[in-house]
């Protein structure tokens, strides 16, 4: 997250989208703002810089942020951790002892665990940000209600998808150079997305599948 933010800041300054920040304290706060350091969201300086310069905290905003933080903590502790506990217990058994039905059940639980874990952290980050007077990017928009793969990626880890679109997909040419180049660009983006999630072959294969 830290690296992606530095790249976006440097690219935006180079493109002239934003002016270079002369105040090192403001720039340092943007780079190291602790609520977003663990699981994001990936913030652009254009938005967060305005929050830094015009930050204000009200009792209403603090209370709203506290509720959001508690909501995210509940998703992480009550849902994600419990689903994860069941998944770990089942997967501790030899694979040949796991029936097809149980495998599907664990697969569904693991899918829910990932969502509630990641979105829970994002909710806590947004909540802490509000409590401190910052408006952070919403990272999830009910992705499992999406009807297509494209819609899913517009709803899942929104700040990461937007980052890859603006700093990789569009600079590569986006969809402006014909079908073959568009497919190549999408494959590169999803390979990088898979590698971002993990350096193992399974994540690379996952990225190639979606690409």
Can you annotate each of these PLM segments?
Residues 1-211:
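Membrane-embedded transmembrane alpha-helical bundles that form the catalytic cores
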């Amino acid at each position: 997250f830290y690296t992606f933010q530095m790249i976006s800041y440097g690219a935006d300054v180079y493109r002239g989208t934003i002016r270079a920040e002369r105040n090192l304290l403001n720039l340092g706060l943007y780079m190291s703002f602790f609520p977003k350091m663990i699981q994001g969201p990936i913030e652009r300086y254009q938005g967060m810089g305005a929050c830094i310069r015009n930050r204000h905290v009200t009792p209403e905003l603090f209370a709203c942020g506290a509720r959001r933080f508690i909501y995210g903590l509940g998703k992480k502790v009550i849902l994600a951790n419990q689903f994860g506990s069941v998944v770990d217990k089942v997967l501790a058994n030899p694979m040949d002892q796991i029936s097809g039905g149980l495998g599907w059940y664990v697969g569904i639980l693991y899918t829910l665990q990932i969502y509630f874990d990641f979105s829970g952290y994002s909710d806590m980050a947004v909540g802490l940000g509000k409590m401190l007077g910052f408006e952070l990017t919403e990272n999830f928009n009910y992705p499992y209600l999406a009807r297509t793969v494209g819609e899913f990626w517009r709803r899942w880890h929104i700040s990461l998808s937007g980052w890859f679109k603006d700093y990789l997909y569009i600079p590569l040419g986006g969809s402006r150079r014909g079908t073959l180049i568009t497919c190549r660009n999408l494959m590169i983006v999803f390979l990088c997305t898979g590698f971002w999630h993990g350096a193992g072959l399974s994540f690379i294969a996952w990225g190639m599948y979606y690409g």
